[in-house]
Structure formats: structure tokens, C-alpha cells
Amino acid sequence: MTTKTTDETFTVDCPICKKAVIWSPQSPYRPFCSKRCQLIDLGEWAAEEKAIPCENADFAMDPENNEDWAKH
């Protein structure tokens, strides 16, 4: 959740542990509260525990489209 505090300061919840994080240069890992939470999130993406939803991924299975990708 994002909340606005005084003087245009925003606070967001860390996506991993839900701790409040001030959205400013003093929080270098934002939106995460720490390097640890940032790495946990990265690990979840790398392990394919998280993904961007897609209705149809036929383009990945189409050999004609795959040829184009292989040339690069």
C-alpha cells in the first residue's frame, strides 16, 4: 500500500515483508526495505515462481518466429 505523509513523502510496503519503506534516496532498495528482500524477490523471479501473466504465448512455440530470435 502507498501512503502519503507530510512534505510530499511517500511510504510503500515492501513487497516481501510488508515493512514500511520511505520512497526517497535514503531507501536505496526501494520498493524493498533491504538488500535481503530485494534478493528474495529476484530469486522468486529466477525460479519462475513469479511471472507476468499472458493469455497466449504461442509466439514462443512457433518455429517461424523462433528463427528470427536465433539469428540475433
From Swiss-Prot:
<feature type="binding site">
    <location>
        <position position="37"/>
    </location>
    <ligand>
        <name>Zn(2+)</name>
    </ligand>
</feature>
<comment type="subunit">
    <text>Interacts with GyrB.</text>
</comment>
<dbReference type="Pfam" id="PF03884">
    <property type="entry name" value="YacG"/>
</dbReference>
<feature type="binding site">
    <location>
        <position position="14"/>
    </location>
    <ligand>
        <name>Zn(2+)</name>
    </ligand>
</feature>
<dbReference type="InterPro" id="IPR005584">
    <property type="entry name" value="DNA_gyrase_inhibitor_YacG"/>
</dbReference>
<keyword id="KW-0479">Metal-binding</keyword>
<dbReference type="GO" id="GO:0006355">
    <property type="term" value="P:regulation of DNA-templated transcription"/>
</dbReference>
<comment type="similarity">
    <text>Belongs to the DNA gyrase inhibitor YacG family.</text>
</comment>
<feature type="binding site">
    <location>
        <position position="33"/>
    </location>
    <ligand>
        <name>Zn(2+)</name>
    </ligand>
</feature>
<protein>
    <recommendedName>
        <fullName>DNA gyrase inhibitor YacG</fullName>
    </recommendedName>
</protein>
<keyword id="KW-0862">Zinc</keyword>
<feature type="binding site">
    <location>
        <position position="17"/>
    </location>
    <ligand>
        <name>Zn(2+)</name>
    </ligand>
</feature>
<dbReference type="InterPro" id="IPR013088">
    <property type="entry name" value="Znf_NHR/GATA"/>
</dbReference>
<comment type="function">
    <text>Inhibits all the catalytic activities of DNA gyrase by preventing its interaction with DNA. Acts by binding directly to the C-terminal domain of GyrB, which probably disrupts DNA binding by the gyrase.</text>
</comment>
<dbReference type="GO" id="GO:0008270">
    <property type="term" value="F:zinc ion binding"/>
</dbReference>
<dbReference type="GO" id="GO:0008657">
    <property type="term" value="F:DNA topoisomerase type II (double strand cut, ATP-hydrolyzing) inhibitor activity"/>
</dbReference>
